[in-house]
UniProtKB/Swiss-Prot annotation:
Mg(2+) 4 binds at residues 835, 837. Mn(2+) 1 binds at residues 284, 298. It comes from Clostridium botulinum (strain Langeland / NCTC 10281 / Type F). Mg(2+) 3 binds at residues 823, 835. Residues 1-401 are annotated as: Carboxyphosphate synthetic domain. Mn(2+) 4 binds at residues 835, 837. SUPFAM superfamilies: Carbamoyl phosphate synthetase, large subunit connection domain, Glutathione synthetase ATP-binding domain-like, Methylglyoxal synthase-like, PreATP-grasp domain. This is Carbamoyl phosphate synthase large chain. The keyword Transmembrane helix does not apply. Residues 133-327, 674-864 form the ATP-grasp domain.
Length: 1068
């Protein structure tokens, strides 16, 4: 069935900000879908609130609206643009929920908008737990014994009937949000109450736990004629009970018999046919490891995290094919874009193994509860490809950037076998290392399989790796012969991993490899197991005989990607990498990307000329460089992951384009940077690097408290803190020196000033600043967690001139060619520099979109030797636009148990939204709504606990809230303060006092908003920490910065109405 000619203009809903459970995979699928629609001559209108995405670029859709993803704003776009169709399945859970709401409220009918692809009825059957269960029983597909409940009593009755443990799954939520496994009635009370609150329809499925069964997924495509293919099946190494987003996943499945494979494949197709899916769908099964019994867990009637993985694992462009199916094409009419000979109805065949390992944010949150369960906690993931499971797994382990090149982890060596057992029975992100340690101590394989629920097939593979590691540990380098080294390399061991075990340097192993000619060859991912030639291939390394890479003689550049999404290094860096590649291609240069993240646009098959899906380690990158012999390597756009390779590449005499390794060092090494600032006569907050607790105390005495302390060479403010007295400083320093004895700790005088930031481009002679950005929160809140305003609202002309002068001096002083990011503080009329990053930063996509300056494109051309004056955007500070744009951070702390919520110098946000308006108030209003910060709620109760040095500042804000009709609950001192000002307040007992106390007030739903300015951020023993956590877990707003609170209250005061606001198409 060819293209439906009635479809002329399609609205695509994006997935909004990156949160745990919904990351970069929807930028990848959304971009692919928009391109698929445009290829067919269809006009595409996009709404998405996330500025850090490729899909919101002006060339991806015809009209781009960076507006809040709410029914009100989507309706505005529909009313203005009048699309005839809506494609709902590309924006993750956010997009689906919005589409259902638009349908239910009659908005789609009112404007005559048809849903294309999977229908709303089918989406509901897939998402609504009750409808889904009814469909399954109608077609005789087994589901787990379960009950749908909408209140607490029914939930308890069901649990008592079938016994604990019980799995709680709320309807219409993301990444297992609000769900969990309840082992007792007390746990059920807590999980069920939250689940009912977070489900948009107040509905929760309680099901009998089949913890320990295998979890298997099928990624299936179906068209309107009922043709169905399975793109890929995947096996979770971790059993049911750990969310699939937190599981290690392998494709294709390794332990299913042919009968099991076919049985679940038939079930998947049966389910898609009965629900009437048109497009892609993910089906999850629980399979009893001891029989052929299985049960359907759930389906995702949309593209998902798993479909991004399946796409990258097979080379089959699921989102693009789904967009064509939505236009009316059938699978046998859609060409496979990788081969351009075969059609989309060919099932991909894999002659390799793919492993996905999640990337968790626990390095950012030391006190977090790391135990994995049904609620997803990973921020991102890596994918590794190998010719065998061991190779893919070891590649995956080193791709995580956790400093692990083997399965050995020092901290598990000290544990007893009982302690190790506990670590694998309640598995956390490090469970594989605990499991390896058990195997190292000859613990029986069948016992390990029994207590972990991991199939013996995988345990055997892990044991082989452990045995080889032990053998290496007991050997000397002279014992390593050609045959053994070849076998280790074939199974994925890295030079560094082998060297560490033999106590030699990686260089020694590299030398032996070169003598014996043990070098990797590269194989192709081509969707068809090599049966047809692929026109846009990507590659993985293996130690086989036949090499499939054709190396050209063209001028070529390698761009190093940024690896997995994590807090501090998110999708913004993928945005920069992709734009760099596009700029190089425009200049006729062959481009090669190296990256390992399956969720991103940069690893899509048709972005670069060649893609290497490899770990971003020294060895793996060097192998590719030696193979391709590029004219240069670009590191500036891959965040800290890429920058870390600068010194290594310099040692190997490999040319890097743009800023050199020595120049990077000048910006990142504290002493060299201080010398430069002195030479340039640029002020910075006083401070220095210290090597002991005693030095620190002495320096703090000189500077005067408060002081800012942090490790050197970090990303996203990791390990930074503001300390107010000696006790706090000693606590911080003793911990910091314990973690890292090799580098100094930096200690600065903390200035409570206005923070200002620039991303600039330098060609070695001039600089261009696309825009000066101002932070709403004062210095001390990490720039990635601050609300950012552009153009600036409170910065004088003199200071702006000084910013340009300092930026130029610094860029030329360091010798920057390309990007530089500088953060300033304005304090009492003076300008200080607090940080310089010699690379692209996370604000690049935001400032590119709102200033309309193609920053990455210009920076790339400058790195290749062009001059700013010839590129059409001039030099100096670029002219300011009329519209005001704010970037508002979005947090995922609710999904991470026992994690600090409080804003401070260490970054915590996972994503961001954009608010665009004619005035700052309008922009902030949209930004807050986009970030799901409640500003519409009329009246309510504020729980306030304010520390002493913030009380004076809090009063005028409290008075404003009071005049808006808000009631107050407060602890003794804050209550006294409010009473003195004539504000009515209910006093509540402190945490240490008897019930009912402050936590009970939160748990009894007496509060709508918590305002808590912390006395000491990161110590979870403090009351403030428990108050903030209790509030976040009840889905309440928690505000810890008075600057943010003041902005929210000012906006509430203005009483802005949705209907009076304009929406802006940013595509022109």
């Amino acid at each position: 069935m060819p293209l439906n000619k009635d479809i002329k203009k399609v609205l695509v809903i994006g997935s909004g900000p990156i949160v745990i459970g919904q990351a970069a995979e929807f930028d990848y699928s959304g971009t692919q879908a928009c391109e698929g629609l445009k290829e067919e001559g269809v006009e595409v209108v996009l709404i998405n609130s996330n500025p850090a995405t490729i899909m919101t670029d002006k060339k991806v859709a015809d009209k781009v609206y960076l507006e809040p993803l709410t029914v009100e704003f989507v309706e505005k776009v529909i009313a203005k643009e009048r699309p005839d169709s809506l494609l709902a399945g590309m924006g993750g859970q956010t997009g689906l929920n919005l589409a259902v709401e638009l349908y239910d409220k009659g908005i789609l009918k009112k404007y005559g908008v048809n849903v294309i692809g999977t229908s709303i009825e089918s989406i509901k059957e897939g998402e609504d737990r009750e409808l889904f269960r009814n469909v399954m029983s109608r077609i005789n597909e087994p589901v787990i014994q379960s009950e749908i409940v909408t209140d607490m009593e029914d939930g308890k009755d069901f649990a008592n009937k079938i016994g604990y443990p019980i799995i709680v799954r709320p309807a219409y939520t993301l990444g297992g949000t609000g769900g969990g496994i309840a082992e007792s009635e007390e746990e059920l009370d807590e999980i069920l109450a939250l689940g009912l609150q977070l489900s948009s329809i107040g509905q929760v499925l309680l099901e009998k736990s089949v913890k320990g069964w295998k979890e298997i997924e099928y990624e299936v495509m179906r068209d309107s004629r009922g043709n169905c293919i399975t793109v890929c099946n995947m096996e979770n190494i971790d059993p049911v009970g750990i969310h699939t987003g937190d599981s290690i996943v392998v494709a294709p499945s390794q332990t299913l018999s042919d009968k099991e494979y076919q049985m679940l494949r038939s079930a998947s197709i049966n389910i898609l046919n009965s629900i009437g899916i048109k497009g892609g769908c993910n089906v999850q099964f629980a399979l009893n490891p001891n029989s052929f019994e299985y049960a359907v867990i759930e389906i995702n009637p949309r593209v998902s995290r798993s479909s991004a993985l399946a796409s990258k694992a097979t080379g089959y462009p699921i989102a693009k094919v789904a967009s064509k199916i939505a236009l009316g094409y059938t699978l046998d009419e859609i060409k496979n874009a990788v081969t351009e000979k075969t059609y989309a109805c060919f099932e991909p065949s894999l002659d390799y193994v793919v492993v996905k390992i999640p990337k968790w944010p626990f390095d950012k949150f030391q006190g977090a509860d790391r135990v994995l369960g049904t609620k997803m906690m990973a921020t991102g993931e890596i994918m590794a490809i190998g010719s065998n499971f061991e190779a893919a797994f070891l590649k995956g382990t080193r791709s995580l950037e956790i400093g692990k090149y083997s399965l050995e982890h020092k901290k598990f060596r000290e544990l007893s076998i009982e302690e190790l057992k506990t670590r694998v029975i309640s598995p956390d992100d490090e469970r594989i290392f605990a499991l390896a340690e058990m195997l190292r101590r000859d613990y029986r394989m069948d016992k390990v399989a029994e207590i972990t629920g991991i199939d013996k097939f995988f345990i055997k593979k892990f044991r082989w790796i452990v045995e080889e590691e032990q053998r290496l540990r007991l050997s000397k380098i002279d014992d390593l012969d050609k045959e053994w080294l070849y076998k280790l390399k074939k199974k994925g061991f890295s030079d560094k991993g082998i060297a560490d075990m033999l106590k030699v340097s990686p260089e020694d192993i590299y030398r032996l490899r070169n003598i014996w000619r043990i070098n990797p060859i590269y194989k192709m991912v081509d969707t068809c197991g090599g049966e047809f030639e692929a026109l846009s291939p990507y590659y993985y390394s293996t130690y086989d005989v036949y090499d499939e890479v054709e190396v050209s003689k063209n001028k070529k550049v390698i761009v190093i990607g940024s690896g997995p999404i994590r807090i501090g290094q998110g999708i913004e860096f993928d945005y920069a990498s992709v734009h760099c590649v596009k700029a190089l291609k425009k200049l006729g240069i062959e481009t090669i990307i190296v990256n390992n993240n399956p969720e991103t646009v940069s690893t899509d098959f048709d972005v670069s000329d060649k893609l290497y899906f490899e770990p971003l380690t020294e060895e793996d990158v060097l192998n590719i460089v030696e193979k391709e012999k590029p004219d240069g390597v670009i590191l500036q756009f891959g965040g800290q992951t890429a920058i870390k390779l600068a010194n290594f590449l310099k040692e190997k005499n490999i040319p890097t384009l743009g800023t050199t390794a020595d120049q990077i060092d000048m910006a990142e090494d504290r002493e060299k940077f201080d010398e430069l600032l002195e030479k340039l006569k640029i002020a910075r907050p006083k401070g220095k690097g210290i090597w002991s607790v005693e030095d620190g105390l002495e320096e703090a005495k000189k500077l005067g408290f408060p002081v800012l302390v942090r490790p050197s060479y970090v990303l996203g403010g990791q390990g930074m803190e503001i300390t107010h007295d000696e006790k706090e400083l000693v606590y911080y320093l003793s911990n910091a020196f314990q973690k890292d004895k090799k580098n100094p700790i930096l200690i600065d005088k903390y200035l409570m000033g206005r923070e200002i930031e620039v991303d600039a481009i330098s060609d070695g002679e001039d600089v261009l600043i696309p825009g000066i950005m101002e932070h709403l929160e004062r210095a001390g809140v990490h720039s990635g967690d601050s609300i950012t305003m552009y153009p600036t609202q409170n910065v004088s002309k003199d200071i702006k001139e000084k910013i340009l002068e300092y930026t130029k001096k610094l860029a030329l002083g360091i010798g920057i060619k390309g990007m530089i990011n500088i953060q300033f503080i304005e304090f009492q009329g003076n300008l200080y520099v607090i940080e310089v990053n010699p690379r692209a930063s996370r604000t690049v996509p935001y400032i590119s979109k709102v200033s309309k300056v193609p920053i990455v494109d210009i920076a790339t051309r400058v790195m290749l030797g062009e001059k700013l004056n010839d590129l059409g955007y001039g030099v100096g500070v670029y002219k300011e636009p009329e519209l005001i744009s704010v970037k508002v951070p979005v947090f995922s702390t609710q999904k991470l148990p026992r994690v600090e919520v409080c804003l401070g110098p260490e970054m915590k946000s996972t994503g961001e939204v954009l608010g665009v308006g004619k005035t700052l108030d309008e922009a902030l209003y949209k930004g807050f709504i986009g970030a799901n910060i409640s500003i519409k709620k009329e009246k309510g109760t504020v729980l306030a606990t304010i520390n002493d040095h913030d009380k004076e500042e809090f009063l005028p804000i409290a008075k404003k809230l009071h005049s808006l009709g808000y009631k107050f609950i407060a602890t003794s001192k804050t209550a006294e303060l409010l009473k003195e000002e004539g504000i009515e307040v209910k006093q509540v007992r402190k945490l240490k006092e008897e019930s009912p106390n402050i936590i009970d007030t939160i748990k009894n739903d007496e509060v709508d908003l918590v305002v808590n300015t912390p006395t000491k951020g990161n110590d979870s023993k403090r009351d403030g920490f428990h108050i903030r956590r209790a509030a976040i877990e009840r889905n309440l707003g928690v505000i810890t910065s008075l600057d943010t609170l003041k902005a929210i209250v000012d906006i509430k005061f203005k009483e802005i109405k949705d209907e009076t606001l304009y929406i802006f198409d940013l595509s022109n």
